[in-house]
Amino acid sequence: SASTQVPLPEGAKVLVYSRGSVPATTLAMMEKGFTTVIAASKTTYTAVAGDQIGVDTVANIVTITLPASPAQGDEVTIMDVSASNGFGTNKCVVARNGSKIRGGTSDLDLDSDNECVTLIFTTADKGWQIKSSNYTI
């Protein structure tokens, strides 16, 4: 059984056919878009609903922009994957892109090492809410 790697553009949808040899855990990870943003090569990324974004801020601050027209129930997860000097050294800015975050009109700064948040879009009045996190309120 041969393996082939194919580069895909950001936000691409993929249909995977398997003869049963791909573990279910691998397919589950592929269901949502997992992307890694490394500050040494990229300092901005625009999320799409369902994204799970690993952010490495070892070199610079990174800005993750939330989807522009979210639907109720859309989720985006952002996590610090820096080996050292993560969000505590160079923060990750979550740009609201026109929607509110926790009912407010300010962007969200993630500035603690090992921080991980899942944001879920609720309503236009409340906007993005923190569904689960180690984010201290």
Range-by-range predicted roles:
Residues P9-G20, S112-T123:
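Extracellular disulfide-bonded cysteine-rich modules/repeats
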Residues R96-L110:
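Terminal beta-strand-rich extracellular "head" domains
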Residues I78-D80, G103-G104, L119-I120:
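Glycine-rich loops and low-complexity Gly/Arg-rich segments
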